């Protein structure tokens, strides 16, 4: 399911985005952010992170560097090390 959700993002990035001027106020771009968020966090959490990011991408936001949050690690694996 995750890979299926990434197909429209890839299509946009490689087929449609080059035809339009860059409008994203953030780095990485919103499409790169969405791809990475879904790839790292899964469809539900990554999709939610992507929607929140798109909501922040508007002319009144200063933009800037906004990376995808790191994947949380479980406490048991960090205690075992």
From Swiss-Prot:
Q: Which organism is it from?
A: Pseudomonas savastanoi pv. phaseolicola (strain 1448A / Race 6) (Pseudomonas syringae pv. phaseolicola (strain 1448A / Race 6))
Instruction: Output the Gene Ontology cellular-component terms.
Output: plasma membrane
Name the membrane topology term. Peripheral membrane protein
Name the principal localization, coarsely classed.
Answer: membrane
InterPro entries from the entry?
A: Membr_insert_effic_factor_YidD
- Pfam families linked: YidD
SMART domains given in the database record: Haemolytic
Family named by the database record: Belongs to the UPF0161 family.
Q: What does this protein do?
A: Could be involved in insertion of integral membrane proteins into the membrane.
Cytoplasm among keywords: no
- State the protein's name: Putative membrane protein insertion efficiency factor
- So which domain of life are we looking at? Bacteria
List locations, semicolon-separated: Cell inner membrane
